[in-house]
């Protein structure tokens, strides 16, 4: 193997291991990557020597090594998601004239990482570092919508809190809301976090097509119901930004995403 193809194949092995819930056999890796077994064992040996793979001989399986953990930890220290998202969110806020935010899931809560305001900002209760129940803001709903059903059930086994009396209050209502998000391709909430404010959001996906973060626009909503006709326009703007960030982090949308 020459250096460049070998490097690409080695990285592909690491991605396969990272996508699995636990260690797997060399044969499984070879099948998934359509590689000869001899090539797979050679790659695994090199990765093991470098500390990126650990061989569990008793189980005849391979898992990620400590070097992979160290690399992941270094990635987090560099705050790459926030650094990549900041200029995109600034442009989004300027285009739509509303506050743009980046959020991530922490259990059943939505944590805001970034907030970019337009030149004439509106006062919001959400800010960087603020956590909210993930089932209320559009930012959280769009992430929950792309999680496995069993994961969502584990996060929400019973009834949950509301802030304004709006939003899902039971697992059944949440399932219905998330199904609508998946069908639509984006999430929307009206007054579930703060009265007289609404938001729309799209998901950012990682290289496995899993929800990584959300891009949202929040705006004051005090008008007749007819003003909702502008929401698809705002949703398209968030979709453009979320898709750009997905590409920049090396991600891809899941096959079912519209």
Where do the language-model regions lie?
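Sensor-regulatory modules in signal-transduction proteins
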Residues: 204-207
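Amphipathic alpha-helical effector-binding/dimerization core
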Residues: 58-158
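N-terminal helix-turn-helix
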Residues: 1-83, 243-251
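Juxtadomain coupling helices with adjacent low-complexity linkers
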Residues: 177, 184, 195-196, 212-258
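Short, basic/aromatic recognition patches
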Residues: 84-92, 155-201, 247-248
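Short, structured helix-loop boundary elements
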Residues: 3-7, 61, 65, 78, ...
